[in-house]
Amino acid sequence: MNHLLSMEHLSTDQIYKLIQKASQFKSGERQLPNFEGKYVANLFFENSTRTKCSFEMAELKLGLKTISFETSTSSVSKGESLYDTCKTLESIGCDLLVIRHPFNNYYEKLANINIPIANAGDGSGQHPTQSLLDLMTIYEEYGYFEGLNVLICGDIKNSRVARSNYHSLKALGANVMFNSPNAWIDDSLEAPYVNIDDVIETVDIVMLLRIQHERHGLAEETRFAADDYHQKHGLNEVRYNKLQEHAIVMHPAPVNRGVEIQSDLVEASKSRIFKQMENGVYLRMAVIDELLK
């Protein structure tokens, strides 16, 4: 694996291999590789807590040294292009670049970069490591994907998580459904849009998404009402209690409590939200190992 850019670029065999390797790192079954003498730069052009810190933790566990990079104090603020920034880091000896960028498909401009790139999110395009850690969490729970009913609720149109998980879950044989306000429907993703109350008793996984306020126009934001959204599309106690006994609740976070999900359900027994974060470290360790070996 030369780069990790999109879930659409991964075969199902590669997905299972990454999940297995991550699980072995988590259990201690797999010995940690020694990447002492390897250097990584994390380039985050959008804000991040979980993804950035998770990658940093994964890098530390694998023995990598991290090159400090802050967009606000770099030459990006002087107008330097993404390509020139990445080429500079390659030239000074970085072995791996982890990049989050607000532009969809930013990596298409980096074809002449000769070190591995891990996409940590591109605009509303793809978020492959989030999808992989979600798949790991689901596989831990069920041990399979074929036939699972997955309901993805939220801002489908603007969510890179929705797009990545749609492609990967479909490829693995799961049944994907969406629930979203009409304004956030994405017709390019061929899955049915359903009323949450019509399917809540039959789904195996409810995957809630954050509202992507930063990608909305002024008119769209003016129309948005958190209480109305929560009533029509959020997971409240009534809906939670209708879930099957084995069903689980997921969210890539950050969570807007009281909007996508009732606050006291974030750590309820069916919630795997913080388990996803835990798994993210081991999954990203597996990705880094594949990219650098």
Swiss-Prot record:
One of its GO terms (biological process) is amino acid metabolic process. NCBIfam families: asp_carb_tr, PRK00856.1. The lineage of its organism: Bacteria, Bacillati, Bacillota, Bacilli, Bacillales. Heterododecamer (2C3:3R2) of six catalytic PyrB chains organized as two trimers (C3), and six regulatory PyrI chains organized as three dimers (R2). It catalyses: carbamoyl phosphate + L-aspartate = N-carbamoyl-L-aspartate + phosphate + H(+). GO terms for molecular function: amino acid binding; aspartate carbamoyltransferase activity. This is Aspartate carbamoyltransferase catalytic subunit. It comes from Staphylococcus aureus (strain JH9). Its EC number is 2.1.3.2. Keywords: Pyrimidine biosynthesis, Transferase. Pathway: Pyrimidine metabolism; UMP biosynthesis via de novo pathway; (S)-dihydroorotate from bicarbonate: step 2/3.
